[in-house]
């Protein structure tokens, strides 16, 4: 017997993995095929199967994919989870509330989940019962389990939640049908989380404006038809096209028109046409302690971790419900208890010495690589990382770390001891002390940590090698990190070194003004032009583009032959912005390096910004490895780190 997150009946062959999966970027919403090339289920279809996963992870847009699968007839027949998850169930809840479509979701104990993963067939009951067998039932048996969702009454929704008079009025329809349905969805999520009350939010960032299929547009247009109106200041995430230039960029009307219509619908509901996946770069960025309702995984992680604002990782559609009501469930990272670290990560002495010894050679590829690794280790636990107290990352470093962390973790918050605002010390991050001096180095003793329900993991150089190699296209899933590491602890050479590059993809998350300045300086100092076979494309928000243009950064970038694209991001861009002839893409984004192969069917390489510029001028991927992974700091084979110098070959880097 499990806990029914969405009650219902369903059965089918079990498709199982012990690794979480982001439905967006991980499953094709048109046919249900797993497309995340790093996932063990890659290439298999979830349609009609009982899908067993620990949880979802990564993108808030997973709820959109669930709804697309439901309405398109390609959804699983049921879902079995072993950990908490709100993104996947939210897609089903919206399907029930607006479209009368559903599938059962049950959370199992770890032991029962392991049993389910080893079974051939599962039958889910509306009471949360799960019957497992080693024999696969016939299609007719599975079809007989399909069910029509039973509507939860308003009284049942309000029964265990403290509601204000205006909440009850909204639930009763006093503020219109859009707000009424939004309140029902909010209360269903609150009940799912065991929440007893709602709280006010000061602002919302909507991730659900990304067009991945007709279901998302139907949702937004229904809110408009009900004359919905957002109650709090609301910004919009990057949409699926450059709203002002998609025709000029050669995008087909098949995508351009519905994607634009979706963005327009949210603007009509009262949102600002910000169209950026980095809302923390806007003047409206929240302050520490401010309760907000944000979607977009990288933005949520950055707001919680680096700004000290408070938000759960709100699924697409739920973000709009919060904007319509100004209310959110009082749970997760909104509460002190949900922000305390429950995993301590330490750098082993070798890795710490290498990182600290790198000094100025600790380039901008380090932070997304580390974020990717920390997210993998953290999964659903809030982590605190120690060992970097003497390092001072920039805002862009933390942006890259947050995006990478949000790609591999399901949790919405991390702490870096001595760096992020709620972790001046390790003990503070664990909730053991307050008021400590910022950047104080605190080695909480093992006995103290041992009294808490806190796991501890040591990160090794080999772990970082594995993460970098995966991002850089070296590892297919069977190749070990040890095989990539030489006896001295550095990355070995690779057949990928010097590989031809046809596209340089920058701006995931959206470029900042400071990144525009760095790129402009690099390109202006280059003695070589852009390679004729390479496209350089940067995505960024409208506000950033305007400020960068005002400061004079845009001219050298455009003079180099780069294309600046606003309103959308690499998570949504396809052909023709991705050239049809491009076979290999290089990026400085760990998020895009992870999702890109599944999204656009190209091979991805990973480098820092300097390495990406080198690829744009040479048409080849950089050779060697970052100095912080080289077998000795200052190795002559260490690649593209440090500052630029003019040489006969044009833009090069020196340590």
Give, region by region, the residue ranges found by the protein language model.
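Feature captures the catalytic cores and cofactor-binding loops of soluble hydro-lyases/lyases
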Residues: 2-126, 514-517, 521-599
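Intrinsically disordered, low-complexity segments enriched in small residues
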Residues: 20, 45-46, 55, 132, ...
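Gly/Ser/Thr-rich loops at beta-strand to alpha-helix junctions
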Residues: 57-60, 84-87, 205-212, 236-239, ...
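Glycine-rich, N-terminal phosphate-binding loop and its surrounding beta-alpha-beta segment
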Residues: 60, 64-78, 82, 93, ...
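Short internal beta-strands
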Residues: 76-83, 230-235, 276, 384-387, ...
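A generic, well-ordered mixed alpha/beta core segment in the N-terminal half of proteins
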Residues: 90-110, 121-123, 229, 236-326
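Extended, charge-rich low-complexity interaction segments
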Residues: 136-139, 143-146, 261, 269, ...
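Acidic, Ser/Thr-rich peripheral helices and adjacent loops at domain boundaries
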Residues: 250-258, 429-456, 547-567
